[in-house]
Design a protein with these regions (language model features):
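Conserved short alpha-helical segments that host acidic/polar catalytic motifs at enzyme active sites
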Residues: 1-268
């Protein structure tokens, strides 16, 4: 299992604050859990105002992967000031299943994953859980190229943006497409997906089974924050939650079996 974090904000959040959350999230471990949420890779996807997306990620490192990624992004921001903060972001910390532990050192096996499609459609996702029917879904995506295969082992999470993109090409109903994805995925899964095309952008949150929890905060300004665990956000972004009057919209505990689909429009 892994951990996911992200947001849609009207004012940018600094990368220092982003990585403060991710570093807390990757070591999060409740007393009844055997392993922490992360520690074997980390990644972020930043969506810019023009709809372009920049992804940065690392595999397992000697110390904190989120800390290592923070340094990479900090150095990159010297050349690109747009990487110093973000209004729309997906974040991920990785703890792979035993069968995929051999891929931990490869950044290609870390998330976010992305799929590019016709009609200038892009889907970016971060995922926590296990897609039990990934082989069946992978078989329906024969023409697709998958980044994780460069690490020598296909990562089940990568079917999600590719499969969702194909659903979107077949139907115009955004909500219906997200529900279809939720229904199709077998196993315990939590995912956040950015759907971006020429005219619109949406953030979808889906949750099914027991993938270790999800908390969502929202306010009346259309802003949203989500995280697998509430503590990293409440600790590191307390002033933001208070000043912008965020309220807890959804709270699913790490032991709870639940189903959820939320869709938010991303201002473009």
């Amino acid at each position: 299992m892994c951990g996911i974090f992200g947001f849609i904000l009207s004012k940018p959040l600094s990368m220092k604050e982003v990585f403060a959350v991710l570093k807390k999230l990757e070591v999060s471990k409740y007393p009844d859990e055997e392993f922490p949420v992360g520690g074997y890779g980390a990644g972020i996807a930043i969506m810019f105002a023009d709809g372009d997306v920049r992804i940065e990620k690392v595999g397992k490192t000697a110390d904190s992967p989120a800390g290592e990624l923070e340094e990479i992004v900090k150095n990159a921001s010297i050349m690109n000031a747009g990487l110093s903060n973000a209004k729309v972001l997906l974040g991920h910390v990785r703890n792979p299943s035993p069968g995929n532990m051999g891929t931990a050192k490869f950044k290609e096996a870390a998330q976010p994953f992305v799929g590019h499609f016709e009609q200038q459609l892009t889907v970016v996702s971060v995922h926590n859980g296990t897609v039990e029917n990934w082989k069946d879904l992978r078989a329906d995506l024969k023409e697709h190229v998958f980044e994780s295969e460069k690490a020598g082992s296909f990562i089940d999470s990568e079917v999600i943006p590719h499969y969702f993109g194909e659903i979107l090409l077949e139907q115009e109903d955004v909500d219906g497409a997200a529900y279809e994805l939720l229904d199709t995925l077998e196993g315990s899964n939590a995912a956040a997906l950015l759907q971006i095309d020429e005219e619109n952008a949406f953030l979808h949150l889906i949750y099914k089974g027991k993938p270790r929890g999800l908390t969502v905060w929202a306010n009346n300004k259309g802003e949203v924050i989500f995280c697998s665990r509430p503590e990293p956000v409440e600790k590191e972004l307390e002033s933001l939650l208070l000043s912008r009057k965020f309220k807890e919209k959804i709270s699913i505990s790490h032991q709870e079996d639940a189903g959820l689909k939320l869709t938010f429009r991303v201002p473009t």
